[in-house]
Structure formats: C-alpha cells, structure tokens
Amino acid sequence: MTEAAGGMGPTSHSFFSQRLRLHYVDYGSEGKPLLVLVHGGQDHCRNWDFVAERLRKHYHVIAPDLRGHGDSAWAIGSQYGMPEYVLDLAQLLRHVGEAPVTLVGHSLGGAIVLHYAGIYPQNLVKVCAIEGLGPPPELIKDVQGKPIEERMQTWIETMQSLPGRKPREYASLADAEARMRSANPHLSPAMAKHLTIHGVVRLENGNYTWKFDNYVRAWGPYRYDVEGVQRLWGRIQSPVLLVRGAESWASNPVTDGRATFFRDYTYAEVEKAGHWVHHDRFEVFMGHLGSFLGVAS
C-alpha cells in the first residue's frame, strides 16, 4: 500500500476457479467478521486500499482481482460473463471458509455481489452496490430490441477484432497517471498515483500498460435477463445500500424503478461524484458506508 493509504499493505494470496489461478489480497484482522470488496471492470483489487484501511479494524477484509484483471489469470476464450464472475466469488468464499459475509462492490463488482446475494441470501449480512445495477434501462431496451442475428454478428466481429487491438502503452508512470487523471477528473493526486502504481505492469520494452485483458471489454450476444436479475434482487434478505454519483452516467435506481425490487434498501446519492464514487468523494462515501455498516469509518 502506498504511504497515502497508510499501513503496511495487504498480503497476496491465490485460489483456483474453473482451472484459473485467481488472486486476492488480505488486509488482516482475521477472526473479525468477513468483508469482501469487489472491484469493477478494467480495475484491480488495490483500488480498495483506502476503503480497507478504514474498515480493517472492524472486519477481516479481503479483495479479489476478477478473472482477467490485476494479478489474476486471463481466461482462455471469451469466458468473461456474469455466471463466471459470480462462480469465482462463490469459489473465493468457499476457499476462505468464513461466513456470513458482508459484500461491497463497484460497477461490475456491484452487479456480481448482488447476484451472489440473491443466489445465497442466507450467507449475507449486508450488501453495498456502488452503481452496480447494470446498464441503464433505456440502453438495455435498445440492445435487446435488436434481432439475435444482429447481436451475434456484432459479438463475432468484436471477438475477431480483439486479437488485433494493441493495449495502450505509456513511456512512464507519469504518463499513465496523467491518463488516469484525465479519465477521472475528480481524483486527488494521491489517489490517482496510488491507482496507477497498482494498475499497471511494466513490459519488456520498458513501457507500462494497464493490468487487464482486452477481452474483458466484450459482452456476450444473449439478452440481458431483466426478469431473472430482478428476481435475484428480490431474494436478497439483508439490508442493501445503493450508491450513485450525482454526475455519473448511471441511471438513478429510485426514479427508474429498479430500487423497488429490493426488500430493504437505502439509497445514497453523492454530489460532485461520477461513476467512481468511492474515489471521487472518498470521505463522503465512507460516511455513508460506515453509517450503513454501523461502524466508525
């Protein structure tokens, strides 16, 4: 962990899921209630360092690198779908062997933890999803309105193009950090530096590139199971915190009606924050999360 995040940093561990060696970090405090932090797409587990540092005195905190992300193995083929991600989380929890669990996820990670919570509601204490309800309803309608042959053609063409898509390289860490800050203008300098250091790998030619598989960008051609996902949301028995950045592209789950599928939810909208709420307004986010969890943050 960088000096900005404090502490000595987490320890690295691995587990296996579907023959892939996957990575996770452990922030210590074993014996306390388990808290798992799940990152979003094209991100990495160390983006949770600041959050984990605040919560490790209350929880045994761990955070996985999703398949194809960070220091986890890349899938062979195109196996980057929600079923695989949820299975990986279930496998991690079986590997750790602690229950029940509190889950926090961002974006794709938020969708993953909500799926898991709906499949295994008895295993959960509380769930927090930061913009983790999936694509906005209008986008889903647009995509699902296309015939299957068009969706299949688009997917095939995307998959065929990915081998020729060269990952972006940066001559220095400073260049990579500049790109990080341009994509996330709300980031503090310390946060941008931290996310960059842990988000890149140095190549043989001396350049840097982001630590994720380009194939994670592709989504499958089959329709998003709106009714199935809503059923899973409705099966969650534990309290749910839904967080959204007021300046994000993500749809408001209260006004668009999706929040009504949860039995027991709290909604928090954070001003001057985009999609990465926990980075953009860290202290405000921690206030909401700490209040929801019932701990000092």
Predicted segments — roles?
Residues A273-M286:
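Catalytic histidine-centered segment of alpha/beta-hydrolase-like enzymes
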Residues Q230, G234-A273:
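Conserved loop-alpha-helix segment in the C-terminal half of the alpha/beta-hydrolase fold
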Residues M1-V36, R56-Y59, G97-P100, G134, ...:
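Alpha/beta-hydrolase fold catalytic core
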Residues V125-E169:
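Flexible "cap/lid" loop of the alpha/beta hydrolase fold
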Residues G110-P121, V127:
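Short glycine-enriched nucleophile-adjacent loop
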Residues V25-W74, R258:
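Conserved HGGG/HGGXW glycine-rich cap/lid loop of the alpha/beta-hydrolase fold
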Residues S17-Q18, V25, R56, I62-L108, ...:
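Active-site loop/oxyanion-hole signature of alpha/beta-hydrolase fold enzymes
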Residues G164-R223:
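Conserved alpha/beta-hydrolase catalytic His-Asp/Glu region
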